[in-house]
Amino acid sequence: MSPKLAVIAGDGIGPEVVREALKVLDAVEAVHHPGITVETLPYGADHYLSTGITIPPAEMQRLGRDADAILVGAIGDPRVPGNEHARDILLGMRFQLDLYVNERPARLFDDRLTPLKGKTVRDLDLVVFRENTEGLYVSVGGAFKVGTPDEITIAEELNTRKGVERIIRHAFSWARAHGRTRVTMADKANAIPAHALWRRVFDEVGAEYSDITRDTRYIDAMAMDLVRTPESFQVIVTGNLFGDIISDLASILVGGLGMAPSANRHPGRVAMYEPVHGSAPPLAGKDVANPMAAILSLAMMLDGIGEEAAALAVERAVRAAITAKVGTSDVGGTLGTRAVGDWIAERVRAG
């Protein structure tokens, strides 16, 4: 059976960057013939505002059952100030489909893209594995006496042994499979007693991987060290909130959010791929958005469905574009969104 890809272009610049990713997928089909069936879904702000529906529960179940992968552009629109549709679509997929692995690679394709003096492509090639279904994002808590001087808000952080163990084990397994020799865990165990669970499980699981060095950092120290000595890190594993923050920091070190792809996975099930950047409504329709994060997310999708050669071809085409200074203004280029997508697609076709 042919692999099935569901596409949610979303809001703002989402449709523009997804358009270019699908253009590159057409080039992949012409050369590598993976035979991927693409289904475009309407969900986003426009759909929500016209129907009152974010994404039907039955649709979520269908995606989990029938799709091999989901590609999302970006979700978020100022016309929906409560962000209900983004919460239901993005967090809904992560939680309801149990996509507990958030994989965010940060790889420098050209020395000129990093703001760090003296650092090169040899110093910046790391992956952040973020626990994607627990932590502070589970919305346990609430508010009391809202709008009064006595207002109270509470947010509980949820950490289960199962959740902590499976993301840590995934990080070590990935490191071994990809020839990485060090896994670093970030927490705040010196100030948050619950993070002792992360430390215990990290040591227990790490002991099963004697070929891999393990170390731990407090998250504030890691933020400093990631900027000062990024070459110290190969694989980072951490919780939901810290992973969200540290992966954004890592992305700016390799060229910005326009170069930052991501995958949301549960091995053996459907996976969701998306550029890390947001919907950037002020940029929508101006042909200025960098499509490379979406295209690199496509490459991660291809790798995830077993099309390793096609994934490598896409990644090489993006690298060639950066080397040739073909890009949007955020990476030092002069081209628009469409032209960048055209160039990368033609590079893939050329082989």
Give the positions of each predicted feature:
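Buried hydrophobic positions in well-ordered alpha/beta secondary-structure cores of metabolic enzymes
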Residues: D11-G14, D68, F129, A171, ...
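N-terminal glycine-rich phosphate/adenylate-binding segment common to multiple enzyme folds
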Residues: Y48-I154, L241
